[in-house]
Amino acid sequence: MNFDSSPIAAIATAPGRGGIGVVRVSGKNISSIIEAVCATKGAELQPRHATFTNFVNADGSVIDQGLAIYFKAPHSYTGEDVLELQGHGGPIVLQMLLTRCLEAGTDIGLRMAQPGEFTHRAFLNDKLDLAQAEGVIDLIEASTEAAAKSASQSLSGAFSKTIQDLVDKITNLRMLVEATLDFPEEEIDFLEKSDARGQLNGIREALQAVFTQASQGALLRDGLNIVLAGQPNVGKSSLLNALAGSDVAIVTAIAGTTRDKVIETIQIEGIPVNVIDTAGIRDASDATDEVERIGIERTWAAVKTADVIIHMLDANRGPTRADEQIVERFPENIPVMRIWNKIDLSGHRPAIDRMPDSTHIYVSATDLQGMDLLRGELLRLIGWQQTGESLYLARERHLVALKSAHDHLEMAAQHAAHDSEATDPALDLFAEELRLAQERLSSITGEFTSDDLLGVIFSRFCIGK
């Protein structure tokens, strides 16, 4: 995203009708817009005070009435002068007010904001770092209470502070290494007297703890896609209804009732889970019509995109050759849980049986026996841990950076393991790996970040944020 410092304006509230709508303006020399749009009868707006006023056209006709709030730089969201006009939340009146602001700001070059540009300016003006900026959009998009709490942690700077603490520790260790390299004549045994290995091990342990928390937080953000697959009439739709707690899928005794995907989003321990019910799988030649055949094709397409496959089986009937053929087509890289349904008919009790290659759980979707076992095993399978600690709503780029930093620290540990003189090349390599680890961690908060990445991140925001 190329930075254009011209003043910007946008509607800051969500599209649609509401009780209140906000038009936001940010940039230099916006006092002319205040004078032109706000009928304050000569009184100046006091910074950070709400002033009730009419919003007017150039001819003095009233567009709307509401509150005008002026934030003087640097005490604003963007770090620039900001004007917020809070009026009624109708889309037409808000568009009229925005158009009036753009007309009044022609002389100062006022233009429409790009997606995420207000937050981008906040980042450039050091009002927040990159991880906090991502926390803004994660908080807006949070689909569960747990995800919202974790996003709030990132927005408040908790994640950034943790990363900065790691960076500071690596920096201190680098300073000792560089000093030893610069003054070899002192003949200091750096690795022993500065306890470099001990410091490095402490950093590695701290980084691993952060990675664990971030990985858990990523589950809260990205959620999980679970596909229910199996032969017709084994209870896939009944299981979807049991997990959802309502009748979201049609259930009948007729095999092949489900003809297309049915998707329902639920929560398990605060993790958003997309449960995808699919058409029953059987040989295409046995399909009753073209619609069922297409439904079976879509089932296999859904299976390929799953994070976890739940293979539904009939506990009352037992395993069949058709079940084995279905298993043979499952992708090898996707974990599979085998759920034996209808234990209310078979005489089985709710149970879980973990085998080397798969997990078998016995349930009844109609009377909900074994459902807690199923939910718990799903969490275990995806690596969810109840740590009791605050989680960071990490993104994929955060996890990649943390993993890369970990790898560089591992290489540094290997170089530090050599019993060598201070001037040995291994110490140079030790210092370089520390530098690279520090750089990877700093990319999380935006200290070392390419313009291309910034453009991608902020383009995902809404226009007025």
From Swiss-Prot:
Record GO terms (molecular function): GTP binding; GTPase activity; metal ion binding
Gene3D superfamilies: P-loop containing nucleotide triphosphate hydrolases, Probable tRNA modification gtpase trme, domain 1, tRNA modification GTPase MnmE domain 2
Binding-site positions, Mg(2+): S237, T258
Cofactor: K(+)
EC number of this enzyme: 3.6.-.-
Cysteines engaged in disulfide bonds, as pairs: none
Pfam annotation, one family: TrmE_N
Domain of life: Bacteria
Compartments, record wording: Cytoplasm
Annotated binding of GTP, by residue: 233-238, 252-258, 277-280
Sequence ranges assigned to domain TrmE-type G in this UniProt record: 223-383
Binding site for K(+): N233, T252, I254, T257
Gene Ontology, cellular component aspect: cytosol
Amino-acid positions noted as binding (6S)-5-formyl-5,6,7,8-tetrahydrofolate in the UniProt annotation, renumbered to this chain: R24, E84, K127, K465
Function: Exhibits a very high intrinsic GTPase hydrolysis rate. Involved in the addition of a carboxymethylaminomethyl (cmnm) group at the wobble position (U34) of certain tRNAs, forming tRNA-cmnm(5)s(2)U34.
Quaternary structure annotation from Swiss-Prot or TrEMBL: Homodimer. Heterotetramer of two MnmE and two MnmG subunits.
Family matches, as NCBIfam families: mnmE_trmE_thdF, PRK05291.1-3, small_GTP
PANTHER family: TRNA MODIFICATION GTPASE GTPBP3 (PTHR42714), TRNA MODIFICATION GTPASE GTPBP3, MITOCHONDRIAL (PTHR42714:SF2)
Annotated family: Belongs to the TRAFAC class TrmE-Era-EngA-EngB-Septin-like GTPase superfamily. TrmE GTPase family.
Protein name, UniProt field: tRNA modification GTPase MnmE
The organism of origin for this protein: Janthinobacterium sp. (strain Marseille) (Minibacterium massiliensis)
